[in-house]
Design a protein with these regions (language model features):
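Active-site and adjacent substrate-binding regions of carbohydrate-active enzymes
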Residues: 1-412
Length: 412
């Protein structure tokens, strides 16, 4: 589940005001318990998106911090400075929206650090109180029976001058504390890292005493470079690089997700790979957002179901855990005109009925509209229609996943 916590929803719920509750528009803790119970009854596991790096600027911690005296423990819950050039080597991630990682606060009379949007101030993990609070959040949801956490933006927890402020040793120390909390429950709980880093920098998150799995975003970029160039050279290199992992740990292999297809500034993959993708996928300038391409899988592949099958056949057969973004099994499209990354976050197309069967709400109450773009209209591209067509993309995915379950060699 992407963030379900109370939030002003300025960034899709990743701007959190209370880590131990449910957004009132979604229900309450009792409703969450019912959902968890129903999922477990169907042998489904529920993983929560846990945003460790930052809060909303409306979180009570930040509101107290900005009024607290400079240098006080309450102020130091966040990262403050008099100098907005500090940590100058840390790239601005949301470069379409932010010109700096620092924002001036009139009340505090200091700058606060934010690796994400300016309304998402970074927590200060140098402060032991912050670590204790966030470990308490882990405990809270473990006690409620969740089956794991997708640890959002884990490389950014600590800062150091002269570095990119990513994947520092202190970050790994804290993640080992998280692992210890999980192990103490004696339950089978998954810790999954979102770390958009090269393979050699992402692999340390998979140490035996750290996390169980991590997304391999470098492999994703190389897959698209192979499609764009018609050559598997970069893909072979990336696969070789990803071979050695700690026992029991796994790469998670996504083709797309709810963000832009992240390519980066030449750090995740080389500038040559980035240029290959830019040239070969023929995406217009308007589809570029921050450091990547803001399209869903099907439009990236020009609506070609054969390319969809080839790429998914790869991630279903490679060592690791395939990650299927909802709708990609149908060839769902996107809404490029929507704000920020909302283009990739439209409702799932279940049926040809109103709003794709996702909701019967009137249009003004929908957070995002269903797809009606030519070639991707939800009245044509949906689960109900494709279930009835033996040769549909959906049924192809079902057959492939059945093969994966039956053949142990495909489950390494």
């Amino acid at each position: 589940l992407t963030p379900i916590y109370p939030s002003p929803l300025q960034d899709g719920g990743y701007d959190i005001t209370d880590f131990k509750n449910i957004h009132p528009e979604l229900g309450d803790l009792a409703a969450f318990h019912r959902l968890l119970t129903a999922a477990h009854d169907m042998n489904l596991k529920v993983i929560l998106d846990l945003v460790l790096n930052h809060t909303s600027h409306l979180h009570p911690w930040f509101q107290r911090a900005r009024w607290a005296p400079k240098g006080s423990l309450e102020r130091e819950v966040y990262v403050w400075s008099e100098d907005p050039t500090k940590y100058a080597d840390a790239p601005v991630l949301f470069r379409n929206f932010e010109s700096s990682n620092w924002e001036w606060d009139e009340v505090a009379e200091q700058y606060y650090f934010h690796r994400f949007l300016h309304h998402q101030p970074d927590l200060n993990y140098e402060n032991p109180w912050v670590q204790d609070q966030m470990l308490g959040v882990v405990d809270f949801w473990l006690e409620r029976g969740v089956d794991g956490f997708r640890l959002d933006a884990v490389p950014f927890l600590f800062e150091a001058e002269g570095s990119r402020c990513e994947g520092l040793p202190e970050t790994h120390d804290f993640l080992r504390k998280v692992r210890h909390r999980v192990e103490a429950t004696g339950k089978d709980v998954l810790l999954l890292a979102e770390a958009i880093q090269p393979v050699d920098e992402a692999a340390p998150y998979l140490a035996e005493d750290e996390l169980h799995a991590a997304f391999n975003f470098a492999l994703t970029a190389h897959l698209f470079a192979a499609v764009a160039s018609g050559s598997s050279k970069n893909l072979r290199f990336c696969l070789h690089e990803a071979q050695t992992l700690a026992p029991g740990s796994r790469w998670v292999l996504p083709l797309r997700n709810h963000d832009e297809l992240w390519l980066g500034d030449g750090h995740l993959v080389s500038e040559k790979v980035i240029q290959t993708i830019r040239a070969g996928l023929h995406q217009s300038h308007g589809h570029w957002l921050n450091w990547g391409i803001n399209r869903r899988l099907a439009p990236l592949l020009n609506g070609d179901p054969r390319a969809n099958r080839v790429l998914h056949a790869l991630i279903y057969s490679l060592p690791g855990m395939p990650c299927l973004y909802y709708g990609d099994e149908l060839g769902m499209g996107d809404w490029p005109g929507l704000r920020d990354r909302d283009a990739n976050r439209t409702p799932m197309a279940w049926t040809p009925a109103r709003n794709g069967g996702f909701s019967v709400a009137p249009d003004p109450l929908l957070v995002l509209p269903p797809i009606t773009a030519p070639g991707y209209d939800y009245r044509v591209v949906n689960v109900e229609v494709q279930k009835q067509l033996p040769g549909s993309l959906l049924n192809w995915h079902r057959r492939m996943l059945t093969c994966r379950r039956l053949l142990s060699a495909l489950r390494l």
